[in-house]
C-alpha cells in the first residue's frame, strides 16, 4: 500500500472545491476530485495540469448513490487507499417557499444532504479497513442561520450539520474523525453577484481550514469550525 496520503474532494472542479484540491496537493496528498459531468471534470483537470497541480478525477453525480459508491471505490483502487474525504459538492435553489418547486427542493436536499450520506456510507468501510481517516463536510453558516428564500438550502445545511455531528459519534471509535466547516459568505460563482466582494471570504480561506483540520493530532477532533468574514458590511 502506498504511503502517500490520498484525498478525495467532491465538487472539486471550481470555487471552494478547487481551492481545496490545490491546497491538499501542495501539502503532498495524492488528490482526486469529482465533478458532476465528464465535461466539467475533464476541463478542471486540464486547468489544474496547466497550473502544475497534480490531480486525478471522476465524474459523479452527488444525487446518485451508485455514482458515489463507484467514485469512492475508484479512488481507493487507483490511489491504493482513501485517507481524507472532503464533501464539498453542493447547490442551492433560492425562492419563497410558496414559489419554490418540489423539484428544486428535492434537488437541493439530494445534492447537499443525501450526496454526503452516500459518500460517507461507502467511504467509511474503506477507511476502517485501512485503520481510519478524516472526513470534512463543507456546510455553511446557513446551517444555523435561517434566511428568507432559503427554505431548501437551510433545510439541507441544517440537516448536514446534524448528520455530521451524529455520524462523527458513530465513527470516531473506528479511527474516523469527522469535522464540519461552516463558512460565511465566500466570493465564488455560487452566490449572487455582488458589486463589492472585497469583504467576503476567499475560497482559499476555506481550503486553509480544511488543511488545518487534517493535520490535527489523531487524539483530537475539532468537530466544527465556524468561518466568518472579519469585516462584513455593517447593517
Q: In which residue ranges do the predicted regions lie?
A:
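Conserved glycine-rich cofactor-binding loop
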Residues: 13-14
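The beta1-alpha1 cofactor-binding region of Rossmann-like NAD(H)/NADP(H)-dependent oxidoreductases
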Residues: 38-39, 59-71, 102
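Substrate-binding pocket helix/loop in short-chain dehydrogenase/reductase
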Residues: 96-97, 101-106
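C-terminal helical subdomain
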Residues: 173-176, 180-181, 188, 195-235
